[in-house]
C-alpha cells in the first residue's frame, strides 16, 4: 500500500531514491521497484550485509562500526549518506537492525535503526519490534520504513 503512495509522491515531487539495506535484505528495494514506472524514481540499491561492504561501498567509517556497532543510528546515517551520494539520488534510505534468532552487539532481537535523508535533511529512526520470527521482523521493518518515508513525503507535498 505505502509503495504505491510513495511512487506517486516521488514522481509528483520529481525526486529520486536509493536504498542501502542490511537487515531487510533487499525487501525495501523490492517494494519500491514493484510499481510500474519505478525507473522514474528509483536510482538503485545496495544490500550491505557485511561490514566491509558498508565501509568499502558506502563509505561508512570503520570507527563508527568499532565505536557504535553496525546496528546503530550512526551506521544507518552513514549508510544513507553513502548510498545517496553513490547513486546521485535526492533521497537516501538506509537500515540496520537485528531480525534473527539471537542478539548481536548486546542489542535485542527486533531492534531497527534507519535513516532517511531528503535533500540535506536527515531523519533518524529507532524502533523495537516484539517479534522473535526473522521473516516477520523483516516484513515489519520494511513496512515501518515505508510508512515513515510516506509520512515524510506527505509533509513535503
From Swiss-Prot:
InterPro entries: CinA-like_C, CinA_C. SUPFAM superfamilies: CinA-like (SSF142433). Coiled coil: none annotated. Gene3D superfamilies: CinA-like. Belongs to the CinA family. This is Protein MG115. It comes from Mycoplasma genitalium (strain ATCC 33530 / DSM 19775 / NCTC 10195 / G37) (Mycoplasmoides genitalium).
